[in-house]
Structures are given as structure tokens and as C-alpha cells.
Swiss-Prot record:
NCBIfam families: uvrC (TIGR00194). The keyword Nucleotide-binding does not apply. Residues 595-614 are annotated as: Disordered. Its main location: cytoplasm. Residues 14-91 form the GIY-YIG domain. Interacts with UvrB in an incision complex. PANTHER family: UVRABC SYSTEM PROTEIN C, UVRC/OXIDOREDUCTASE. GO terms for cellular component: cytoplasm; excinuclease repair complex. This is UvrABC system protein C. InterPro entries: GIY-YIG_endonuc, GIY-YIG_endonuc_sf, GIY-YIG_UvrC_Cho, RuvA_2-like, UVR_dom, UVR_dom_sf, UvrABC_protein_C, UvrC.
């Protein structure tokens, strides 16, 4: 705590208000509210805190405060300050998720559309729906029943929808406005759950069609009735009064809060909104902040009622939401709030369970591996593999795992420079010498463990270079594969021995992932190099076609076959002079001969870890 903060802490009033924490750059990193500014702000700089609060406090170099007349005024100010400044430590509805609505437009001849924007334009809005797929499903059903116009600008001729019975083509059939308003009312009734009349009408039409032996049309009516029934079953009735309401529940544990919002429309639970985030203040105060942001940021209609838990300040919510606010004591409304709270608890428990499993797969795996090999926990593991075909285009690759996860920015690729022919041991010697010679020269941080994709011979070569040539003390292990090319044994120690490692353990799965990844990276690099070399050999000896133009051709056409099939004009468009383009075509198409198979391979010059060690 610096002297500026110490001085300001002495000046804090006991009034309600907002406080604003800033970092060394003057950036606002957190906005909070308090009933008593002095007590709240001082609490950040006294005593111990959990990890997330310690992280916040470590960045605070200054703070400001704004006094308000009441705690509710402080709440409203806090929400506006968060919206304006977007502090990184505050609760933020970052995705600004907007839900789809079905809308009947306020036009002379109305349309039925899906929108995410609710406007005061006289249109009728129904929703929100959980996603655009659910909204489209209902709209498709409505389109089959109600022939609203589909075109934004009505055409002079009838459209496709007219021919399939989904548009009245009002410019031709001359239905009056009253007809369409009546149809809009039927849709409104349907979306409010009053669909019995529509089903009765469809049943009557189905019976008439069947009596007239129009069986295809009768089947269409039957399918519509079944579709309505299916839609009904998907929407569970949660309240008998068929009202629209949002139901809030929250749960806190281990410094995290989960808020669940149930969207109940016409008594049916149609969707829920789930948000999990760390909290820094009293849970009920951070919950109020969330509610304020929810209705300020979300594009969704405020319902007739909002149900909240018992421990929340009802008057504060009323200041945030222009709706009837209830804290139900009993009955089905109380059950709805309890259900939202229960779901919030389950969601938070699932988050912690997933975190524990993730730690078990990564941090737990490297800790167990360290104990098994009797070395410090191998936070950073570097693994090597070689790749060549009969000694051609020999390469090696290194992948890096940090805390049990791949760190692709640290991957490295090596072209073998000193080895002639297929000599895996010599290739391993070269790449280990190059990598750790550089680590030694540039004082880079060495890994905690080196894993060689290979058996005893490759591991011993690596040991010779690391320990005898370079004098480094880095543990080295080897991963042997079986005859099915699967991870089989872990070799470690001096002399090397097979480590007793359970094939069902997380540490074995980690080593398996490392071996698979380094093999993938090495073989991918080898294929790229081999294809590139084949490409170069095919175009060698053409005057005016240097390395840069060859590379441009490959980037544009992707393969020799595509270049061979291209016209001279198309090659010229890549920046190759016409005389050179003609020479390329003559070289690649001598009397119509076919190109070798390898020319079909594509080359991608942009891969992860696209770095070559010296």
C-alpha cells in the first residue's frame, strides 16, 4: 500500500457511494458500491484475502470515490460506471447475449419475422426464445398455418410461397386489412398458449379433406396437429396462472457466484440464462449489480413479474426493473425460485468438478509423474522426434508441454544439416546439441524433463550430449512404442529401466498425448518439406524463376497439379513474366506427361510453432 492510498483512506466518509480502483496506468480496474465507503474501501487493504481479491489489490495504486444519497443510488451509479468503463475485475455480461423474438410487424399487411431487437414500433413481440433454432421451429410451424406475406417489398407477381400456400399474395387476392389483423390475433393467441381453437380448426379441415378423398391435404393437416402437440410437450407448464415472469436464483461457493434466470412465458419455462463469475463484495450486493446489468444490457422484454430470493432487497430491485417484484413465501412461485437456486448450485458444483478433473489431468498428472521418477514436478516438458523416409529430407521436431498442456508458441522444427542417410541416432545427437547448446549460450530456462520419442539408443545419445558434452543436469526419459506403434513403455534412470507406470493413470495419458503430438508435428513438417522439395525440383532450371517466384506460385496454386492445369495468363497474374510463365508450362507439360503423385500434396507454410532453431 503506497503513501497516496494511506492518505486517502484517512479521508473516506462513512456515507454510501461508489469507489473506483485504478492501476499504475490510471486505468479503472474495479468499480464497487458500499453502504459505508470508509469500512468497505479500507477492508481491501487490511487482513488476508482469497487469491482473486489478492490479485485485484496487488494492482491498485490509486482509488477515487463518489458519495451518493442512498445505497440504491449507489447501485444505479455503479451499474452505469461498469457499463461505461468495463473494468476487468467487475461482473460483466461480456457476450451481451440477445435472445430472438417472433414479431408480427405493425404494417398494413403484417409479416411474421424473427428479430433480436425489441423496438417501440407498434409490433407484437413474443419471446424470448432460447435460441434462433427454437424460434425458427415455431415460425416454420406458424408459416404453414398462417399465410402472412413474406416479402419486404411486395413483388408485382405472386411468389413461391403463394404456390405452396404460405402467402396470401394480397396484391392479387385483395384481402382487406381486417383479415390480416384477425390472423395476427390468432397468431397472438397461439403464441400465448391458446391453441385449442387452432387445433379444432385443423381437425375440421382434416376431416373435410379426408371425406373429399384429398388424402395428401388431410395428411398435411394431421402433421400440423402433431407438430403443435410436439411443441406443447417441449414447453413444461411451471405456473397455472399462465403469466410471463423472470425467476432469479443464485448460489455462492469458494468465491464464485452462479446466477440462474428462468424465462417463464405463458406459464411455460422456455429457457434459462446461466452466468458464473467471481464476486468481491457481499453476495447479495453483487447479485443486485448483476440484475441491473441484465436488464440494462440484454435485449429482452421486461415481463409482468420478476421473482427474487428472500435475502434480496426488494426496493433495490424495483429501482432497477420496471416490473412487479415479488419475494414469494409459498406456493408454486416459491417453488420456481427454489428451482432456480437449486440449478445455480448444480451449475457451480459442475464447474468445480470440471476444474478438479482438469487439474487431475494436467497438474495432478505432472505431480504424480515427478513423484514416480523421483524428480521435481516437471512443469515444463520438452519432447523430440525424428522423421525421414530412407534418409530423404530428414527433420526433427520439438513440442513443449507446460503444466500438462501444449504450449504451441514454443514448438520448434529442425532441418537435419550434418547427417547423410537414414541415421536416427546421429539426427538425435544433432538436434539435442543444437537445442540445448542454444539454451546454454543464451541462458534460457531449461526444461524440467526431456522426453525422447524412442528407445534406449536414442535416450543414451541424448544423455551423452546433455550430460557429457554440455554438462547440464536435466532428467531425460524415453517413450518406446509397441509393434502397433502405440505408447508402450517409459524408460528412465541410470541405467535405463522400464518404469512401473499404470496404463490407466493420468500420467500415462499425459505421456501418450505428448508422444502423439511430437510425432504429429514431426511428420507434418517432414511432409511439407518433402512436398516443397519435390515442387522445387520440378521447377528447377527455368530461367527467371527464382525461389521467391516459386514460393508465390505455390502459395497461390497450392500444388504442382494446379500450376500444370493453369493457363499462362493465370500464371502471369501471380506476378510471373509471360516468357517465364510460358517456360513453366513447357516444363510441366512436356508432351502431356503426367506429374508424379507427390505433386498432389498441399503445402501449408503457416503452422503452429513455425520456428526453426539454428
Amino acid at each position: 500500500m503506497n503513501n497516496l492510498i494511506k492518505s486517502k483512506l484517512e479521508l473516506l466518509p462513512t456515507s454510501p457511494g461508489c469507489y473506483i480502483h485504478k492501476d499504475k496506468n490510471g486505468t479503472i480496474i474495479y468499480v464497487g458500491k458500499a453502504k459505508n465507503l470508509r469500512n468497505r474501501v479500507r477492508s481491501y487493504f487490511r487482513g488476508s484475502h482469497d487469491t482473486k481479491t489478492e490479485a485485484l489489490v496487488s494492482e491498485i495504486v490509486d482509488f477515487e470515490f463518489i458519495v451518493t444519497e442512498s445505497n440504491i443510488e449507489a447501485l444505479l451509479l455503479e451499474i452505469n460506471l461498469i457499463k461505461e468503463n468495463k473494468p476487468k475485475y467487475n461482473i460483466m455480461l461480456k457476450d451481451d447475449k440477445s435472445y430472438p423474438f417472433i414479431k408480427i410487424t405493425n404494417e398494413r399487411y403484417p409479416r411474421l419475422i424473427i428479430t433480436r431487437q425489441v423496438k417501440k414500433d407498434g409490433g407484437l413481440y413474443f419471446g424470448p426464445y432460447p435460441d434462433v433454432g427454437a424460434a425458427n421451429e415455431i415460425k416454420r410451424l406458424l408459416d404453414r398455418i398462417f399465410p402472412f406475406r413474406k416479402c419486404t417489398n411486395p413483388p408485382s407477381k405472386v411468389c413461391f410461397y403463394y404456390h405452396i400456400g404460405q402467402c396470401m399474395a394480397h396484391t392479387i387476392c385483395k384481402k382487406d386489412e381486417a383479415y390480416f389483423k384477425s390472423m395476427a390475433q390468432e397468431v397472438s393467441d397461439f403464441l400465448k398458449g391458446q391453441d385449442d381453437k387452432i387445433i379444432d380448426d385443423l381437425k375440421s379441415k382434416m376431416a373435410v379433406a379426408a371425406q373429399s378423398m384429398e388424402f395428401e391435404r388431410a395428411a398435411e393437416y394431421r402433421d400440423l396437429i402433431q407438430a403443435i402437440g410436439t411443441l406443447r410437450t417441449k414447453q413444461r407448464v411451471m405456473a397455472k396462472d399462465l403469466q410471463n415472469r423472470d425467476v432469479f436464483g443464485y448460489y455462492v461457493d469458494k468465491g464464485w457466484m452462479c446466477v440462474q434466470v428462468f424465462f417463464v412465458r405463458q406459464g411455460k419455462l422456455i429457457e434459462r440464462d446461466v452466468n458464473l463469475f467471481p464476486y468481491f463484495n457481499d453476495p447479495d450486493e453483487d447479485f443486485l449489480t448483476y440484475v441491473g446489468q441484465f436488464y440494462q444490457e440484454k435485449s429482452h422484454l421486461v415481463p409482468n413479474e420478476v421473482l427474487i430470493p428472500q435475502d434480496i432487497d426488494e426496493e433495490a430491485v424495483k429501482a432497477l426493473v420496471d416490473s412487479k417484484i415479488l419475494k414469494p413465501q409459498r406456493g408454486e412461485k416459491k417453488q420456481l425460485v427454489n428451482l432456480a437456486i437449486k440449478n445455480a448450485r448444480v451449475s457451480l458444483e459442475q464447474k468445480f468438478n470440471l476444474l478438479e478433473k482438469s487439474v487431475e489431468k494436467t497438474q495432478g498428472a505432472i505431480e504424480n509423474l515427478g513423484r514416480l521418477l523421483q524428480i521435481p514436478t516437471p512443469v515444463r516438458i520438452e519432447s523430440f522426434d525424428n522423421s525421414n523416409i530412407m534418409g530423404t529430407s530428414p527433420v526433427s521436431a520439438m513440442v513443449v508441454f507446460v503444466n500438462g498442456k501444449p504450449s504451441k508458441k514454443d514448438y520448434r522444427k529442425y532441418k537435419i544439416k550434418t547427417v547423410v542417410g537414414p541415421d536416427d541416432y546421429a539426427s538425435m545427437r544433432e538436434v539435442i546439441r543444437r537445442r540445448y547448446g542454444r539454451v546454454q549460450r543464451e541462458a534460457l530456462t531449461p526444461p524440467d524433463l526431456i522426453v525422447i520419442d524412442g528407445g534406449q539408443g536414442q535416450v543414451n545419445i541424448a544423455k551423452q550430449v546433455i550430460q557429457e558434452e554440455l554438462g547440464l543436469d536435466i532428467p531425460i526419459a524415453g517413450l518406446q512404442k509397441n509393434d502397433k506403434h502405440q505408447t508402450h513403455e517409459l524408460l528412465f534412470g541410470d541405467p535405463l529401466e522400464v518404469v512401473d507406470l499404470s496404463r490407466n493413470s493420468q500420467e500415462f495419458f499425459l505421456l501418450q498425448r505428448i508422444q502423439d503430438e511430437v510425432h504429429r508435428f514431426a511428420i507434418t513438417f517432414h511432409r511439407q518439406l518433402r512436398s516443397k522439395n519435390s515442387f522445387s525440383s520440378q521447377l528447377d532450371g527455368i530461367d527467371g524463376l527464382g525461389p521467391k517466384r516459386k514460393q508465390n506460385l505455390m502459395r497461390h496454386f497450392k500444388s504442382l497439379t494446379k500450376i500444370k492445369e493453369a493457363s499462362v495468363d493465370e500464371i502471369v497474374e501471380v506476378g510471373v513474366p509471360r516468357v517465364v510463365a510460358e517456360a513453366v508450362q513447357r516444363k510441366l507439360n512436356p508432351q502431356g506427361e503426367a506429374l508424379p503423385q507427390v505433386a498432389e500434396e498441399r503445402v501449408d507454410y503457416q503452422t503452429e510453432g513455425n520456428h526453426n532453431e539454428p
